[in-house]
């Protein structure tokens, strides 16, 4: 099952007993597929049954993606915490995600954000593209369903955050920037969860086997820097250094480059 909703949908994140309304751009996408096991039905006495039979007993992890425009008020900062922070047991912070439309409320249980992509484009609104996974996707009610959690107050205004990138990379000339990008990725591996005993009791999606635990394989930070070519930076394009000190700041338009920036 796969869903993609436009502006009429609302996204909520419930974390630590608190409920956060997250404003997104045009689309929220989420899906979950089920795995099928096939078995032969051809017998010695009936060789005509070439098509195998199948059973569905387990689900793959749920997937989701959405884009959040960042604002000066920072009401959406919870998504940045969920992207970057780990809890004490070296796991990603998990939360329940709800999407409410004009007719339904969907829930992804024990969701984690596995990737966040930032684009630092001069004088553009700063956004973060988020993708992640969860244990189970289900429809929990209609449009009047009450989402649990203590509602966190929102600012009276939502002011788009227009930024420009400020880059420091050792002693290199990082002026005349066209833009920059940054991607934070966490590679996770879901633990095998199916058992023969549980599979025998599966009758439909409500009691199918769902993933429950995962391990973190690795975390990576990647990106790119784009510059106009000038006499001062023409020799910098093929620097293969792997131990450089890099600082990327998203500075609000109108503030000096020495500002600490909204994001660093």
Predicted segments, located by residue:
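Signature of extracytoplasmic/envelope-associated structural regions
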Residues: 1-264
């Amino acid at each position: 099952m796969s869903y993609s909703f436009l502006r009429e949908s609302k996204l909520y994140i419930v974390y630590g007993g608190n409920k956060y309304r997250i404003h997104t751009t045009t689309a929220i996408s989420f899906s979950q597929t089920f795995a099928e096991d096939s078995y032969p039905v051809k017998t010695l006495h009936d060789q005509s049954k070439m098509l195998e039979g199948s059973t569905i007993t387990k689900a793959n992890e749920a997937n989701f993606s959405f884009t959040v425009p960042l604002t000066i008020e920072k009401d959406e900062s919870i998504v940045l915490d969920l992207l970057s922070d780990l809890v004490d047991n070296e796991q990603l912070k998990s939360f329940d995600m709800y999407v409410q439309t004009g007719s339904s409320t969907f829930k992804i249980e024990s969701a984690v954000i596995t990737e966040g992509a930032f684009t630092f484009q001069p004088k553009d609104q700063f956004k973060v593209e988020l993708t992640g996974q969860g244990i189970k996707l289900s429809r929990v009610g209609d449009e009047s369903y009450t989402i649990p959690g203590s509602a966190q107050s929102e600012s009276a205004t939502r002011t788009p955050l227009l930024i420009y990138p400020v880059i420091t990379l050792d002693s290199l000339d990082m002026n005349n920037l066209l833009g920059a990008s940054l991607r934070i990725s966490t590679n996770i591996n879901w633990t095998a969860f199916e058992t023969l005993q549980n599979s025998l009791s599966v009758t439909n999606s409500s009691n199918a086997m769902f993933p429950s635990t995962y391990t973190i394989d690795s975390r990576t930070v990647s990106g790119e820097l784009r510059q106009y070519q000038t006499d001062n930076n023409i020799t910098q394009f093929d620097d293969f250094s792997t131990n450089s000190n890099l600082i990327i700041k998203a500075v609000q338009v109108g503030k000096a480059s020495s500002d600490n920036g909204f994001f660093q």
